[in-house]
Regions:
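Alpha-helical interface subdomain recognition
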Residues: 1-59, 78-82, 89, 93-94, ...
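Short glycine/proline-enriched turns and hinge-like loops at secondary-structure junctions
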Residues: 43, 109-111, 134-138
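Residue-level signal for inorganic ion chemistry
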Residues: 51, 99, 127, 143, ...
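N-terminal glycine-rich flavin-associated loop
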Residues: 60-81
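Short beta-strand-to-turn element immediately C-terminal to the catalytic PLP-Schiff-base lysine
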Residues: 75-79, 143-146, 155-158, 180-182, ...
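A short, Trp-centered hydrophobic/proline-enriched beta-strand micro-motif
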Residues: 93-104
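Flexible, small-/acidic-enriched active-site or ligand-binding loops
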Residues: 108, 112-114, 131-132, 157-191
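A short core secondary-structure module
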Residues: 126-163
Length: 344
């Protein structure tokens, strides 16, 4: 059943259910974090974390992170004079926008940019962006570029001449893209932000995104743990449920402890971001580092306790493990964030 439900969407071009995306808009979920001036509800990191925790429990495929959290945050907090037009289309679900900031061999450093925006009156963009979330479905891209040694964000349409897109499927069945810009013409009114404003917007959007995927991982862990407990109670060996075996009970307790540890760090990060404390970046790095380690442990133990069925397409457990692996590498893995935490 799980396989059939999932395959209905993961093998389509979009990789998610468009009808569910429309429902997200109708329920007001797409408007949650936007300011009231932009037509949103002024919800913050606490509410978004709760939402993403639920996303994690059910392995939601819809591209909320790329559209609302990353691109939405940058647009909503920028001084871009056309932002409300694009935000209203994001909120209604009419348009999708992806952030393109990752480049090859840059070790998660968003300031180290090789994509060049050159010229004065007539601007030309050249370069490549990798690992663009939901790139195949985006109508526009927020692209970080180097313009005269200054970090700049430009808005580029998917139909722009000189832009070629290569699409890929990730280990957890999400969609990412590589964007290649070759002599792409850029007008001055496509510049969203530049200089310190651009760098702060990207930094905060990434921190927001890191919090959200970490909350998603916490939801995944909770679901993994509960499904594993339920499975071990129903599977029998030697005339009794395998949940009666003490060594398996200890392993499930360890899974519970890992999930609760991450949940405590999540609450700390949510509060620091809600109060806009100076420690918000450090708190999120501590959370992300632990989530990467705990998530893989919980996922691997869940698969082991399910036996061979744990890695089958028919059961959700193996898909949780794949999601843990993907989340660990997103926005910096455990070791990257541990180093960032130690240096802050």
């Amino acid at each position: 059943m799980y396989k059939r439900q999932r395959e209905n969407f993961i093998n389509t071009e979009s990789g998610f259910d468009p009808e569910k995306w429309k429902l997200f808009a109708e329920q007001g979920w797409l408007a949650m974090p936007f300011s009231s001036e932009s037509g949103g509800f002024d919800f913050g990191p606490i509410e978004l974390s709760i939402l993403f925790e639920e996303f994690g429990k059910f392995l939601v495929l819809e591209p909320y992170l790329s559209n609302v959290v990353l691109s939405g945050y940058i647009l909503d907090n920028s001084s871009f004079n056309k932002k409300n037009d694009f935000i209203s289309k994001l909120i209604s679900g009419e348009e999708q926008i992806s952030l393109a900031y990752m480049e090859q061999n840059r070790n998660y450093d968003f300031k180290d940019i090789t994509c060049l925006l050159e010229g004065t009156d007539s601007l030309t963009l050249n370069g490549t962006k990798n690992l663009v979330l939901n790139g195949s479905n985006a109508d526009h891209y927020l692209v970080t570029v180097n313009h005269n040694e200054v970090t700049t964000i430009v808005l580029v349409s998917k139909d722009t001449d000189g832009l070629s897109i290569n699409n890929f499927k990730t280990v957890d069945d999400r969609r990412i893209s590589q964007l290649n810009f070759e002599n792409v013409g850029i007008n001055a009114d496509q510049i969203v932000a530049t200089g310190d404003e651009a760098e702060q917007l990207i930094k905060d959007a990434i921190n927001y995104g890191t919090l959200c995927v970490s909350a998603e991982a916490v939801g995944c862990m909770e679901s993994c743990y509960l499904k594993t407990v339920e499975y071990t109670k129903s599977r029998e060996q030697f005339g009794q449920p395998i949940s009666n075996f003490q060594v398996l009970q200890h392993k499930m307790v360890d899974m519970f402890i890992e999930a609760e540890l991450c949940k405590s760090l999540l609450y700390k990060s949510m509060i620091d971001m809600h109060e806009n404390n100076d420690s918000k970046y450090r708190s999120v790095s501590a959370l992300k580092s632990q989530v990467g380690l705990s998530g893989k442990k919980v996922g691997e133990d869940a698969v082991q306790l399910h036996g061979g069925m744990g890695v089958s397409e028919e059961m959700s457990i193996g898909h949780y493990l794949k999601r843990f692996i993907a989340i660990d590498s997103q926005f910096g893995n455990s070791y990257f964030h541990l180093k960032k935490f130690n240096n802050s």
